[in-house]
């Protein structure tokens, strides 16, 4: 069962995907979670902190599993197939997060934005390495 913190992040991702990060108030988010808006601050420092955690985590998970899939595959072709399957499965299973990452990442505080971009570059590098091994 997901922790309360995970439940809040899931609800926030859904609402941010529907209305945008700036289109959701803390009061609305709290109500959707079944708590008061101010009660959210027991779990997160701010709404920005929620966005940062969800987007840093999604980027880190993509990188971690992408590296794992590409390095445990038996060949470059198998690595590419594993990466494609992983990325598509992840995107389909986490549609709200993908929308938020695409649309709202610029709303992140600078430090989190840099962390997300750095992690995304590393994830792209995983793909580049596999593709270059197939087509040098």
Put a short name on every predicted segment:
Residues 11-15, 86, 90, 94:
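Amphipathic alpha-helical interface segments
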Residues 54-82, 127:
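Amphipathic alpha-helical linker/stalk segments
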Residues 18-22, 73, 94:
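Short coil/turn segments at alpha/beta junctions that flank glycine-rich nucleotide-binding fingerprints
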Residues 52-56, 85, 117:
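Alpha-helical transmembrane segments of multi-pass integral membrane proteins
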Residues 13-16, 62-63, 80, 84, ...:
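Short, structured motif recognition centered on aromatic/hydrophobic residues
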Residues 92-111:
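Amphipathic alpha-helical segments used for helix-helix packing
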Residues 4-7, 11-49, 53:
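Helix-turn-helix
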Residues 63, 110-135:
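Amphipathic alpha-helical packing segments from all-alpha helical-bundle domains
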